[in-house]
Design a protein with these regions (language model features):
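A conserved hydrophobic helix/loop-capping motif in glycosyltransferases and polysaccharide synthases
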Residues: 100-116
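C-terminal catalytic/acceptor-binding lobe
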Residues: 2-63, 258-262, 267-400
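Juxtamembrane/start-of-transmembrane alpha-helix segments at the extracytoplasmic/lumenal side
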Residues: 247-259
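Short beta-strand-to-loop acidic/aromatic patch adjacent to the donor-nucleotide binding site
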Residues: 200-212
Length: 400
């Protein structure tokens, strides 16, 4: 009788141990399939994924992007050549507009066939009417080219847009004595101040001539300006390089976002019974919750945070605002009269290699009491400038 009485207890003990041992091999199998098969198959062509096969696809993808940009540039050139014979649509500017967009441009000899400026201005002309009866913003082109050959693309746009330049006396200054980064900073400050002096806008956006706005550019800008934080910020960055958008970063907010994403997905998976088939051995326990939190965190990082951010484009309300990062300045929003403060701060600093205007501005923002700055994600512009105007360029630039 004694062995028979022990049978139920023995079976219960074995069943309990088997259930736990079933979760361990399931976790191992799930991890092996996810990180060894599914994600490599899904991510081997994604440029910003850890699984991207750089040696196989980078050259071809880089060449494809260059050819697409070249075609857009030629199309934009034809578009503005035709438009030059039409009455000016954007040249009559109103004083104190709600938003001024200033596009800073210079001649790029190595990229002259790509016509970056013409691409950007064509995109702006297409999305400016998206705000209803009144166009979304006033637009200026700030031509900072000092060479004798001039900036032909800016000259072509003069038929449709207001183009501002330095006076002949300012052009004669001995700019060659300055390093490239200091000249770039002074050009930026000139455009900030001249745009303000000319129109006194309530808010200002400064785009570099290789920052192509997204279709929802003005809708998101309007939403950002309607939020309370914009009244107390020095600037809002509208672009951050995609390769630097990963979770594995020193920025605290990204680490919190990363852990939060893993925890929410893990809780949802373990909490909803209808998602769990009969063979699923996991329960809402601390051990299983920790495993799936780390599982989803690893999957999100390896596949690429950039691609998760793209889902936020569904609505302006979904765009994320966070403390500003250091690099870079292709697209900047200056709420209120903060553009004047930025011009003063930059004027007081001297830029050199390793201390360009974006680094100087970020360091000043962090040291000056009462100043703060923000970034918006995902990006509101696409950086199309494969050929730099301030650095040495390879013959065929690569995406990475």
């Amino acid at each position: 009788m004694k062995p028979a009485s022990l049978m139920p207890a023995w079976r219960a003990c074995v069943a309990q141990r088997w259930r736990w041992s079933g979760a361990v091999p399931q976790a191992a199998l799930l991890s092996a399939l996810t990180f060894g098969v599914v994600l490599p198959v899904c991510g081997h062509r994604l440029l910003y994924s850890y699984f991207f096969l750089r040696s196989v696809f980078l050259d071809a993808m880089s060449e494809q992007v260059l050819q697409e940009s070249l075609q857009r540039g030629q199309d934009a050139l034809s578009f503005w050549n035709r438009a030059s014979a039409e009455p000016p649509a954007f040249k009559n500017l109103s004083l104190k507009p709600e938003l001024l967009v200033t596009v800073v441009t210079t001649r790029r000899s190595e990229a002259r066939d790509f016509h970056y400026l013409l691409q950007v201005m064509r995109q702006l002309s297409a999305i400016l009417p998206s705000c209803g009866r009144r166009r979304c913003a006033e637009v200026l082109v700030c031509d900072v080219e000092r060479g004798p050959q001039g900036n032909q693309d800016a000259s072509l746009l003069e038929a449709q847009f207001k183009v501002i330049r330095r006076s002949p006396e300012e052009q004669l200054q001995n700019w060659e004595l300055l390093n490239t980064f200091e000249r770039e900073k002074r050009d930026y400050v000139f455009c900030l101040r001249r745009g303000w002096d000319l129109l006194q806008p309530r808010n200002m956006v400064v785009l570099e001539d290789d920052a192509l706005p997204t279709p929802d550019f003005f809708n998101v800008i309007a939403h950002l300006l309607s939020r309370r934080f914009s009244r107390h910020t020095l600037y809002v960055k509208l672009y951050h390089p995609e390769r630097l958008q990963r979770y594995w970063n020193l920025e605290p907010y990204r680490l919190l976002e990363w852990v939060g994403l893993g925890l929410v997905l893990a809780t949802a998976l373990l909490r909803v019974p209808s998602w769990s088939p009969r063979w699923f051995s996991f329960t809402l326990s601390w051990a299983h919750l920790l495993f799936f939190t780390l599982y989803f965190m690893a999957a999100a990082e390896l596949l690429g945070r950039h691609y998760l951010l793209e889902g936020r484009r569904l609505s302006p309300q979904l765009y994320a605002v966070s403390p500003a990062t250091e690099c870079c300045t292709p697209a900047m929003l200056f709420p209120g009269n903060s553009s004047l403060r930025v011009a003063e701060y930059l004027d007081a600093s001297f830029c050199t290699k390793g201390k360009a205007k974006d680094t100087v501005l970020y360091q000043l923002m962090r040291t000056l009491p009462g100043e703060r700055a923000h970034s918006v994600e995902p990006n509101l512009v696409t950086h199309i400038g494969a050929f730099s105007s301030v650095r040495r360029n390879p013959s065929r630039p690569k995406l990475l």
